Amino acid sequence: MNILKIELANVEQTNLGFEHWVDVTYTVPILKNEYTVKLLLFMECKIEDQEVIEYLVSTWKYRDLVLHSLQMYEMEKNNNFTILD
């Protein structure tokens, strides 16, 4: 998996903590397209350091990205799904 971009999109404070919405763009060899997904990092404190966010995504959320890529592979394979430029 090649993660192309990790960008903090939004931070919202709730009664339980801080919701960090992160846009992650990635490619994998089995997919025809690159995809951007929105991931949720739920933390006790507000995190704005880009390196920390990149670390959390690449460690905590890596499995979610792999699952998404497998789902997209199935869609591309079964439905001949492609993104038009």
Where are these regions (language model features)?
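Amphipathic, interaction-prone secondary-structure segments
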Residues: 2-35
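Acidic, low-complexity intrinsically disordered segments
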Residues: 5, 34-85
